[in-house]
Regions:
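N-terminal, polar/charged subdomain of small-to-medium soluble alpha/beta proteins
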Residues: 2-111
Length: 111
């Protein structure tokens, strides 16, 4: 996890290179064997309150977000990376109150 302070004074939380095995792909063999996907998440968070109070309850629980994404991806079975990405974004927004997210999903073995 990294936090970057932007010019507009909004912080950004990064969760990078989550490597997760899942069923993904359109070919018959891809529906039978788990493949590794790599996921990067980037989302805004105002860290001022957490920094001022030094209290965990005022911070974003990025470990819970990472664990939630890992569990979801491991249990999923999509054909397209695009569908997986959309579903991850919805999960993070709905379950963790994140308003916007930048997301990268790649399948290293695909190329």
């Amino acid at each position: 996890m990294a936090i970057k302070r932007g010019i507009e004074m909004e912080d950004t939380i990064y969760i990078k290179d989550l490597r997760i095995k899942t069923i993904i792909g359109i070919f018959d063999w891809e529906r039978k064997v788990k493949q590794e996907v790599s996921i990067d998440l980037e989302f805004p968070f105002d860290c001022k309150k957490a920094a001022a109070t030094d209290a965990i309850e005022d911070a974003t629980d990025y470990k819970a977000i990472a664990k939630g994404v890992i569990k979801f991806v491991e249990e999923s079975s999509f054909q397209l990376q695009e569908t997986l990405a959309e579903n991850i974004a919805e999960l993070v927004k709905n379950d963790y109150g994140i308003k916007s997210i930048k997301l990268r999903v790649s399948k290293p073995g695909a190329i």
